[in-house]
Amino acid sequence: MGTAPAYSLDGGRSLHRWLRDMREHHPVHRELLTRVWTLYRYRDITQATADPAVFSSELWRYLPGDRGDDALTAGNLTAMDPPRHRLVRDLVSRSFTARAVGALRPRIAAIAAELIGAVADRGEMDVVADLSDPLPVLVIGELLGLPMADRELLSDWARRLLSFDKGDLTDEVVRKRVADTQQELLDYLRVHCRRRRTNPQDDLISRLIRAEVDGQRLTEDEVVNFANLLLLAGHVTTTLLLANIVLTLDEHPAVAAEARADRGLIPGLIEETLRYRPVIVSNMRVTTRAVTVGTEQLPAGQLVSLSFISGNRDEQYFTDPDRFDIHRDARKHLGFGHGIHYCLGAPLARLELGIALDAMFDRFSRIEVTGVPVDYYDTPGVAGPRSLRIAFRHH
């Protein structure tokens, strides 16, 4: 069995071989060193996400010595269980509507065109640094109503929070730096939230402050932490997923040519990449009581890792799962999670990705990855390139 090979080793190739073996022989497995249980099969993962009463996202409630800081967890939908999760999600959904997201289309297109235009004469670019990193920060910053002058600051915070590696988590200095960076961002968002409370505008933060369901509103901590979640999760997902798409198309030139010729295939291309090369690798839960999964008995108070990257390649659920097929119905993938914690920002990410791909296909007649070997993040829970150099030709 051994230890899981790092994704960063070879872009997940060795890891996927290892995961296939785990699904077959050890689908529910407890790691001796970390004592964390991992679920590797699609069915077990989705049954866990569908049962938040047993598989809780409020890790701090059930783990001895874990600090439940309301100021940090309030409004963080990913760390919340029903019934509060339902209320907060309803309140957020009133403001973060499909209409609000759709209204961003012209701005996303303009931002993507501007970013691509800035590098078009070079004949080469870093997909991450030049396009997929700044795009979501600019879009989400605009959605939240944050000052244009602060965009580089926001991007820097997001990059710093993504850039620590797995091994760094044991380093107290690194952990403090991560915590300090997170606090800086929260403090910044709190100042902006208080400004909007006294001077509301037509932006998401103002709408979150005003949102009401059954006479209940979001607290200040909840507004601040949701803005933080949207900024960080929205940034990471779109940044790495666009890079993952470009990388995957480079490996499958016939698919790239097909999608370029028929732009109606782009939505299917995005969904299949979310399955084939997801950004969010796993998610944690904690058991609230003893539960049987497969043939294993998990006691109460156990940390459980849901291996989305493994579930997305489960042979029992997806036909020929190691084949990249943009014509398959991949919508049941776990790339945006599953159950009550399915990504609220998924429509925005899909819109950004579709527009960015369209813009790249329109501007460039040929795109080729040149930065080999690719430098991957080794950050826990996410998978994607730290940078991705490409060369291109104009139409």
UniProtKB/Swiss-Prot annotation:
Disruption phenotype: Abolishes the production of epoxide cyclomarin A, leading to the accumulation of the olefinic cyclomarin C. PROSITE patterns: CYTOCHROME_P450 (PS00086). The keyword 4Fe-4S does not apply. It comes from the Bacteria. Its EC number is 1.14.-.-. The keyword Isomerase does not apply. Pfam families: p450 (PF00067). SUPFAM superfamilies: Cytochrome P450. CDD domains: P450_EryK-like. Keywords: Heme, Iron, Metal-binding, Monooxygenase, Oxidoreductase. GO terms for molecular function: heme binding; iron ion binding; monooxygenase activity; oxidoreductase activity, acting on paired donors, with incorporation or reduction of molecular oxygen. Cytochrome P450; part of the gene cluster that mediates the biosynthesis of cyclic heptapeptides, known as cyclomarins and also of cyclic dipeptides, called cyclomarazines, which have both antimicrobial and cytotoxic effects. First, CymD catalyzes the reverse N-prenylation of monomeric L-tryptophan with dimethylallyl diphosphate (DMAPP) to form N-(1,1-dimethylallyl)-tryptophan (r-N-DMAT). Belongs to the cytochrome P450 family. This is Cyclomarin C epoxidase CymV.
